């Protein structure tokens, strides 16, 4: 434990917080180009084929991003918008692709939670 005199001389060092989305470089979203679109399996105890894409961002970093929703139209060289947000059962996936923006289409026939999936309001 430091003495009062040591604290007067030096002071306490605030612990620097580590960012969870370093590739975004402080931006809320980043544009990028898909370099590879593929499926991968989640860790135990879950089982599925999760759709993911390798994306080269405008910041120059290549990241793995999750493609949310049912079905997608992404392929290599698609321009996408990436936001932060990890997928708990996919190790190393710390970003998500924003649906309904740039080359990514929204989810079809989506009735609830539409804004998250870029789905337009259906005409009744």
From Swiss-Prot:
What SUPFAM superfamilies has UniProt attached to this entry?
Answer: Nucleic acid-binding proteins
Where is this chain compositionally biased, Basic residues type? 9-18
Q: Which domain of life is it from?
A: Bacteria
- GO BP annotation list: translation
Q: Which CDD domains match?
A: Ribosomal_S12
InterPro entries from the xrefs?
NA-bd_OB-fold, Ribosomal_uS12, Ribosomal_uS12_bac
Q: Sites of the modification 3-methylthioaspartic acid?
A: 89
The record's Gene Ontology cellular component field reads: small ribosomal subunit
Family per UniProt? Belongs to the universal ribosomal protein uS12 family.
The UniProt subunit note reads as follows: Part of the 30S ribosomal subunit. Contacts proteins S8 and S17. May interact with IF1 in the 30S initiation complex.
Name by which UniProt lists this protein = Small ribosomal subunit protein uS12
Q: Which organism is it from?
A: Acidothermus cellulolyticus (strain ATCC 43068 / DSM 8971 / 11B)
């Amino acid at each position: 434990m430091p003495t009062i005199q040591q604290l007067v001389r030096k002071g306490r060092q605030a612990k620097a917080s580590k960012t969870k989305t370093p590739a975004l470089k402080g931006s809320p979203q980043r544009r990028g180009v898909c370099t590879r679109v593929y499926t991968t399996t989640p860790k135990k105890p879950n089982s599925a084929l999760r759709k993911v894409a390798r994306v080269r961002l405008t910041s120059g970093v290549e990241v793995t991003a999750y493609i949310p929703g049912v079905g997608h139209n992404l392929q290599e060289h698609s321009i996408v918008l990436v936001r932060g947000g990890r997928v708990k059962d996919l190790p190393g996936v710390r970003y998500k692709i924003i649906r309904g923006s740039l080359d990514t289409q929204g989810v079809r026939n989506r009735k609830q939670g539409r804004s998250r999936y870029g789905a337009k309001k259906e005409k009744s």
